[in-house]
Each structure stands twice: as structure tokens, then as C-alpha cells.
Amino acid sequence: YKQAAEIAKQMNWNKVKDWSTLATIINVQEAAGDYEEARDMAILAYNRNLGGRKLIYKLTEFFIKVDDFENAEELYREYAKLSAHDVNKYILYYDLRRAQDAPDTELVDILEKYKEAEIDEKYMYELAELYYKTGRKEDCSKTCDNLVLWFQDGIYVEKAVKLKEKLGVTMTNTQKKILSEINARKSDEEANKERLFMEQKELARLKKDEVGDLLDEDD
């Protein structure tokens, strides 16, 4: 991606009017982590009325990533106006306000509105974390319970179980089993790291002995 992004940088895209081509370049620049270049390409497409609501959403994301909050807010309002029934507007606004260091209580309000319309394990977990930070222990526990019940496994289920353990509240048998599996896996990983370290240490010792033997032969 980085090589393709560098090549794209050197080309003149001002006369390109094909949306699919510009969209590809925007995606390449984003994948390469060059958000300023991706933003500039997205602005080019936006000024030509290409891409529709998806481009407005993406361009707002780029403005957020480069800390241009004034333009991000303006575009967010445009997106929200065009997407009155699109629940993703809550996530876009959440990303914007979080980047602006909004109070946790405000972020909770945004994610609660999103949760009313959409069930997503990532944002359910983030909501649970915000409940924890704002002292809403019961809401945090309940959200963790629902996340485990509805999704059953995966990274956010495991995070929810660990967060509930952090709360110090009673866990269900299913949650205890998940936590036990997490701890067992962690122990295995630590054991493997220790084994690898000892193998490397022994290898280094053997090489040192070999060098010593060669020096003795030279003498």
C-alpha cells in the first residue's frame, strides 16, 4: 500500500472525474496511513459532487484524524442532514466528540442513542467501559452480561468478562468459563515465552562455547 500511495502522490489527479478511480486512490492512501493525502483526494472528489453520503462520511473521518475539527463539524452536520435515519451518524459524532475530548457522560449519551437502534459488540463494550469510568457500576455489569449473552465469543466478549471481573461482581458460570479459558491461554503464552527465552539463552551459550573452542585451537 505504501508503495502504491507514493506513486499516487506523484500523479496529477485534477482532471480525473471517474469516482471509482478516485475512490481506489483514497482507499490506498488511507490503508498506507497517509490521512492528509487521503483527505485531499476526498476533497477533490467532494468538490466534484462525487461519492455521495459515503464520501461525506469518509471525509469527515479524515478531518477528525488530522484534527481539523472545524471542517469535521461542518461536514458532520451535512451528513446528519442527509442521513436522518442512518444510525451511523451516531458513531461518526461519537468519533468526533471523543477526538475533541468530550466528557465521558456526553459520550455515554451518544452511544446509548446508537444502542437503541443498532447492536454492535465493539460499541457495546465501549459503552460498558464508559459506564465503568462514570461510576455506573450496575449499567456496566448489565451491558457486559448482554454482550456475553448475545455474542458468546470473540475479543469484545473476553474484554467484557475481564471488565466484569474488574467490577468485582458475581459472574455467571459461562462468564467464569470464559475467564478461565482466557487465563489458561495467558499462562500458555507466558510458558511459551519462557521456553523460547531459555532456548535462545542455551543457543547463545553453545555459540559462546564454540567460539571458545576455536580460540583454544588457534592457541
Residue ranges with predicted function:
Residues 1, 35, 69, 103-104, ...:
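TPR-repeat structural position
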Residues 4, 38, 72, 106-107, ...:
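Single-residue signature of alpha-solenoid repeat helices
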Residues 9-17, 43-51, 77-85, 112-119, ...:
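Solenoid-like repeat scaffolds
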Residues 21-22, 56, 89-90, 124, ...:
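Canonical tetratricopeptide repeat
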Residues 23-30, 43, 54-119:
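Alpha-helical adaptor scaffolds
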Residues 81-83, 135-156, 161-186:
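TPR/TPR-like (Sel1-like) alpha-helical repeat modules
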Residues 176-219:
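Intrinsically disordered, low-complexity acidic segments enriched in Asp/Glu and Pro
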